[in-house]
Amino acid sequence: MRTFSGKRSTLALAIAGVTAMSGFMAMPEARAEGFIDDSTLTGGIYYWQRERDRKDVTDGDKYKTNLSHSTWNANLDFQSGYAADMFGLDIAAFTAIEMAENGDSSHPNEIAFSKSNKAYDEDWSGDKSGISLYKAAAKFKYGPVWARAGYIQPTGQTLLAPHWSFMPGTYQGAEAGANFDYGDAGALSFSYMWTNEYKAPWHLEMDEFYQNDKTTKVDYLHSFGAKYDFKNNFVLEAAFGQAEGYIDQYFAKASYKFDIAGSPLTTSYQFYGTRDKVDDRSVNDLYDGTAWLQALTFGYRAADVVDLRLEGTWVKADGQQGYFLQRMTPTYASSNGRLDIWWDNRSDFNANGEKAVFFGAMYDLKNWNLPGFAIGASYVYAWDAKPATWQSNPDAYYDKNRTIEESAYSLDAVYTIQDGRAKGTMFKLHFTEYDNHSDIPSWGGGYGNIFQDERDVKFMVIAPFTIF
């Protein structure tokens, strides 16, 4: 998209006006110019169309509409430079416009806005258009130290993370960290974040945090994390997080990269752990002991045109919930947490006892005189998925000794415009066929995060632009 450059006198005047109205002393021009001259205003226009059908095993195995909608998004993201090389401001907003939606489509579709403005008020009744302020943060830096506060997205090493549609979710809180470079000995980075409210990108209003009963208040979430890069292709990461008085979470990751046949092979081991502090068999009692998800990942780029991925996960999640969650509050869209595993094959493959293997490949067609085009495919097979080890009110399908299998495959086609005013605009088509190898209805039988067979088609357009 077109880039505009030059003096930003209008922006400077607006900032000066805001400063004056706020009652702050005007800063000398020489010390304020970094705030203006180093600022950026970027954005994007986004289109999403989805058709997803799901099998209903209670109605003759018919496939029924689960999602069917088309939605536009657009955003503007202002990031200032730093006045006095220390103080700055970031502000961003986006809009969602619902173009069409099938009456049988499920809600929320997570691209438009839910008709329920808050996470804990969600009633699954519909979607709507609207505008959301998703970033409004004061920022600070001094030497190796940085900090941000306000409406923010986590950027450091903690376990807190936002949901994503085209845009990210938003926390109300503060985050601070530091980066230290020790030359050949390595580099250390660490950060801490505290938050008391959150909104997913499909909710318009912030909500507080609660335990699983949606009434017992959790005053805050917080997390501390660190990363050490040894500068020899070996990286260690660790983090700890808490939902006040309720959930503890743990994370560790080791990554190593080395060459095979002249191309890089990236490997990692990842551990995610969580446990609750409730042990009374109430609705807030999620896990028996520590639940965890472990992962091994391998990524290889061959001949500079083929990206190959081989990844595996293993889950332990004994207890009433029956599956592992990376977020510290269990209610849908109430917060989110770090998980560096993303397969885009519909299921989370995170049931108690479940093991899963993923293989994916993406082929860049530039050597076929098709610059910007890429095609890909992936497959997941998972087994030993167990239901919750106990439930207060089990349904007729519940059998704690049962295990089921899941599998899915996906196909991708991508085109990215290589030059001109629309350079960087991407078109992507994604198809998934998901198979639940059982006749248990969606979410039934103690499998609270497994649904029935699906066919899913997504078409996306992402058109970024820069104003200055």
Swiss-Prot record:
The keyword DNA damage does not apply. Its main location: membrane. It is a multi-pass membrane protein. Residues 1-32 form the signal peptide. Gene3D superfamilies: Porin. Pfam families: OprD (PF03573). Involved in the uptake of chitosugars. This is Chitoporin.
